[in-house]
């Protein structure tokens, strides 16, 4: 998460400066053949437009003499060359060889909005080692869902670096066909940003002059990139064909009558994914026998506050393309469409037969259509999972200004003797002085429910957001969710309520470390949620959290907070087999503090602790996440999340643990892997996963994956639990043909 925040903040904040420069810069086509070797002082780079940089942190607006970037193109590729001088080259942070890894290395990030949509961008980052990291930005950086900043989005592109006695340099080569350029007035227009960091100095620089210090937090995104024109560039249609072959050997246990029976499952499968640019503005994706065997397993979570649902991020590649287009904010951390409802049923994977997705623009409207069919699964004595069709339709149209839109979404989940349909309207309205109004309304219909009632089957969300990070800023929201509202393809944090939310904050930046201890401080005076029943007869939940956070000039940050909370339980909440909060009214309070180290350190030890009353007793919550970097080839990431709950009236207490250790290794830029071990004390299971990837080049991979879960206490039930529930070893080969 830290890597996403750092790269996003760097790209986003700098883009305000681009907005101040309205002149379109002409990028000329190269007449030279650029050899991708990481050197930018070669003859082939002469004559290209050179962008200069200005410092963003810690000293605002100072000119930077250490960094330059050049951009050009030929018939097939966009090229970027960056010269990043370093007076102390031995201090370059260079410890990442993993694709999409992040360990606090120095980086160069190139963001491009291919058609000056002023909403969407692709970000290509490279580290001194040559390791690469890419992501997509949607909705102009306005967080409408989990896909606004999407680090799981992978592109086919190349990058090379060189480290010298003067610093380091990088060259990019990005296929034109992957960028979906569209000619307007016989020109190709785009927006760009470039960021360079020197993390040992906690320093970052950007192209072009910088904004005033009082800037919005995340609004200055693609809408304020530097406008450029690619003179003489001709768009190329996108065509990618990715067949795969897969073999797996596995076994699982299922309960049959009076015992657990083992079932072996050995498979050989094949499938194909196709991406085709129907027009310059419309892209069609087709997937047959869709597979996600190489996707890393989810982190284990214990839901102590199990009055809310747990949101897990989408990691599967098929759902990453234009994922932000399908974001529909249905309220606090809630979505009308949640892609993890497809192919995952009650935590169990169900095969996807295939599907299609169409995304792009029709006239000035963003359009998206998605439809997938899952296979039915026979579970023996546990019943079966029916084959289902999942479909989504999405429209969005710009109104008022570049940062505002109105939209429509419809979802439909269909299986034998059942359907669930949802429709909704949403919008984002950018108002003066960094103020945003974000409304949505949606309604659902499903078979075998009570008669449709507009209020009971609907949900309304209204959000007013002052999007700043210094000075005074605030958020205010209202949300209503009817008793029968149930989006079969969505995610709801909470259901059946009225909710009122408000926050009031004050932030302050300091540029001179000789005059202040903290580079940034923030006071949150109020951060409060109030939940009522749908008829306003009872308060369900109320809380207010006030906190202070400060970030030092070296990147270390500290937070302290206090919280009051009220809960009305109409039915007991069970945390473990021995811990249960009974029906009743509860008021509790707790305090906490946390420390997060600067990401430049080889050894990092973030820690968070809180303690206070908790229903009928107390809870001590502790979280530590140590990371140790052993150079470029090996690192260890660990986490320990613990809750010590004591209920004096029941004379019970228990420690609840979730422990995870992840070993990441990389022999070079092509061969890498990881080993993960996780323990969950509530389920009393230990989960293991090992993953090896040989990346010949982007789109050409071999994966070896092993997953298994172990039952630690097999005597929890009668008959005894099996040693494990599922075990599988998979080898997968895929190759992408593209032009």
Q: What are the functions of these language-model segments?
A:
Residues 1-23:
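Bacterial Sec-dependent N-terminal signal peptides
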Residues 20-396:
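Structural preference for beta-rich elements and adjacent junctions enriched in aromatics
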Residues 61, 164, 182, 415-418, ...:
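Short glycine/serine/proline-enriched coil/turn segments at secondary-structure junctions
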Residues 79, 169, 181, 240, ...:
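Membrane-spanning beta-strand positions in outer-membrane beta-barrel proteins
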Residues 85-86, 115, 197-199, 246-250, ...:
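Short, glycine-/Ser/Thr-/acidic-enriched flexible segments
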Residues 172, 189-191, 262-264, 269, ...:
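Catalytic-domain carbohydrate-binding cleft regions of carbohydrate-active enzymes
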Residues 212-235, 375-430, 466, 557-610, ...:
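Outer-membrane beta-barrel transmembrane domain signature of Gram-negative proteins
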Residues 351-353, 359, 428-432, 438-739:
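Exposed, low-structure sequence patches enriched in small/polar residues
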């Amino acid at each position: 998460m830290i890597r996403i925040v750092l790269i996003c903040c760097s790209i986003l904040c700098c883009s305000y400066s681009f907005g101040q420069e309205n002149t379109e810069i002409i990028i000329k086509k190269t007449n030279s053949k650029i050899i991708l070797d990481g050197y930018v002082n070669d003859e082939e780079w002469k004559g290209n437009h050179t962008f200069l940089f200005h410092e963003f942190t810690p000293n605002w607006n100072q000119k930077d003499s250490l960094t330059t970037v050049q951009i050009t193109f030929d018939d097939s590729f966009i090229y970027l060359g960056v010269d990043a001088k370093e007076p102390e080259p031995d201090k370059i942070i260079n410890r990442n060889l993993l694709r999409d890894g992040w360990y606090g290395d120095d980086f160069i990030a190139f963001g491009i909005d291919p058609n000056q949509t002023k909403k969407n961008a692709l970000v290509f980052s490279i580290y001194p080692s040559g390791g690469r990291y890419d992501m997509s930005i949607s909705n102009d950086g306005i967080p409408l869902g989990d896909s606004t900043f999407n680090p799981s989005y992978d592109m086919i592109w190349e990058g090379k670096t060189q480290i010298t006695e003067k610093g380091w340099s990088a060259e990019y080569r990005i296929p034109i066909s992957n960028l979906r350029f569209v000619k307007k007035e016989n020109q190709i227009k785009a927006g760009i940003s470039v960021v360079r960091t020197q993390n040992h100095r906690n320093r970052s620089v950007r192209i072009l002059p910088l904004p005033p210090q009082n800037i919005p937090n995340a609004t200055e995104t693609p809408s304020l990139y530097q406008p450029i024109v690619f003179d003489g560039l001709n768009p190329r249609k996108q065509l990618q064909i990715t067949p795969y072959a897969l073999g797996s050997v596995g076994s699982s246990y299922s309960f049959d009558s009076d015992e657990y029976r083992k079932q072996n499952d050995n498979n050989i499968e094949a499938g194909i994914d196709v991406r085709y640019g129907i027009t310059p503005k419309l892209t069609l994706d087709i997937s047959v026998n869709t597979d996600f065997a190489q996707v890393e397993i989810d982190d284990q979570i214990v839901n102590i506050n199990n009055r809310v649902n747990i949101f897990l991020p989408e990691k599967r590649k098929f759902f990453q393309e234009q994922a932000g287009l399908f974001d529909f904010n249905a309220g606090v951390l809630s979505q009308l469409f949640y892609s993890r409802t497809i192919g995952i049923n009650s935590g169990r994977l169900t095969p996807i037969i295939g599907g299609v997705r169409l995304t792009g623009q029709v006239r000035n409207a963003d359009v998206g259509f998605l439809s997938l069919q899952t296979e039915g699964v026979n579970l023996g004595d546990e019943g079966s999972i029916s084959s289902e069709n999942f479909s989504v339709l999405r429209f969005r149209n710009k109104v008022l200004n570049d940062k505002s839109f109105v939209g429509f979404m419809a979802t439909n989940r269909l299986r034998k003797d059942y359907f669930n349909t949802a429709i909704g309207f949403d919008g984002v309205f950018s108002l003066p002085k960094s103020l945003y109004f974000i409304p949505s309304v949606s309604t659902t219909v499903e078979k075998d429910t009570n008669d449709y009632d507009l209020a009971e089957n609907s949900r309304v969300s209204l959000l007013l957001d002052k999007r700043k990070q210094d000075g005074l800023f605030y958020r205010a929201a209202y949300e209503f969710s009817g008793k029968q509202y149930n989006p079969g393809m969505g995610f709801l944090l909470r259901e059946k309520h009225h909710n009122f939310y408000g926050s009031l904050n004050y932030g302050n930046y300091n540029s001179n470390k000789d005059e202040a201890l903290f580079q940034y401080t923030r006071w949150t005076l109020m951060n409060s949620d109030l939940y009522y029943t749908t008829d306003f007869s009872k308060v369900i939940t109320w809380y207010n959290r006030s906190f202070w956070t400060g970030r030092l000039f070296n990147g270390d940050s500290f937070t302290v907070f206090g919280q009051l909370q009220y809960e009305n339980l109409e039915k007991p909440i069970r945390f473990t087999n021995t811990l249960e909060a009974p029906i009743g009214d509860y008021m509790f309070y707790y305090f906490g503090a946390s420390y997060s180290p600067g990401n430049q350190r080889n050894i990092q030890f973030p820690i968070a602790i809180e303690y206070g009353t908790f229903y009928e007793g107390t809870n001590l919550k502790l979280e530590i996440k140590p990371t140790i970097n052993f150079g470029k080839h090996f690192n260890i990431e660990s986490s320990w999340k613990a809750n010590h709950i004591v209920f004096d009236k029941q004379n019970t207490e228990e420690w609840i643990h979730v422990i995870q250790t992840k070993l990441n290794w990389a022999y070079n830029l092509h061969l890498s892997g990881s080993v993960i071990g996780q323990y969950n004390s509530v389920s009393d299971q230990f989960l293991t996963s090992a993953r090896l990837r040989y990346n010949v080049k982007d789109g050409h991979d071999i994966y070896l994956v092993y997953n298994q879960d172990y039952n630690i206490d097999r005597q929890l039930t009668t008959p005894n639990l099996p040693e494990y529930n599922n075990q599988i070893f998979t080898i997968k080969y895929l190759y992408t043909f593209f032009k």
